[in-house]
Amino acid sequence: MQQLQNVIETAFERRADITPANVDTVTREAITHVIDLLDTGALRVAEKIDGQWVTHQWLKKAVLLSFRINDNQVMEGAETRYYDKVPMKFAGYDEARFQHEGFRVVPPATVRKGAFIARNTVLMPSYVNIGAFVDEGTMVDTWATVGSCAQIGKNVHLSGGVGIGGVLEPLQANPTIIEDNCFVGARSEVVEGVIVEEGSVISMGVFIGQSTRIYDRETGEVHYGRVPAGSVVVSGNLPSKDGSYSLYCAVIVKKVDAKTRSKVGINELLRTID
């Protein structure tokens, strides 16, 4: 694996000079191999090690390099044709392979090669970009987007129109992460490497980036870039120091544990915020 990483790191330093016409065989094979490993879930761009999320930057570099080594090509879809550098994940799947891997894909859901989809996942008409990791039992609902290299945990529900930010455009240091057992409400956006920790509930229409203030109304604490585990979050505003205006924030209205979540529905958690 170290040899593979060395090839990627070296190639990335000269990425501006690499084209589909001049890329050498060793570099092409290394990049292609990494994309295959990401595609099967054998590798992932970020993983939790000793309780902390660690980003493997060299894998992200391999994803970026993959755009340098391929020309656009025509790809066939059920109702249309595509023209892009990155092939579709399911292009070579037959019924036996879909059954073996154990997830559902509802047309016209689109997944790029290099994204991993785990068992018991349901993809409604949605989009999952290269390098993403979607773990077991997750629902990616209609028109939701899982950005490049984003990490989605087990038993997550990404509601209709949710946007989970990627790392490629604009270039971000770390992927956006939604941990296990989280719910993200319709049309919400979580971007710029924000981490939503386990068991959190994000209401409809909440927008969280690295500069978004995440205000805990019980403690008065303000978080940036991280939603603490078990938080129930709605959109809100905080006043300026002189009271002349207010600016958008996300508000943690309560904390819940796994026991409470198992007994109380998502809608009830969001409706009883007083």
From Swiss-Prot:
Subcellular location: Cytoplasm
Binding-site residues for substrate, renumbered to this chain: R104, D141
Record-listed E.C. numbers: 2.3.1.117
Principal location: cytoplasm
Any one Gene Ontology molecular-function term assigned to this protein's record: 2,3,4,5-tetrahydropyridine-2,6-dicarboxylate N-succinyltransferase activity
Membership in a protein family: Belongs to the transferase hexapeptide repeat family.
Protein name: 2,3,4,5-tetrahydropyridine-2,6-dicarboxylate N-succinyltransferase
Originating species: Yersinia pseudotuberculosis serotype I (strain IP32953)
Lineage: Bacteria, Pseudomonadati, Pseudomonadota, Gammaproteobacteria, Enterobacterales
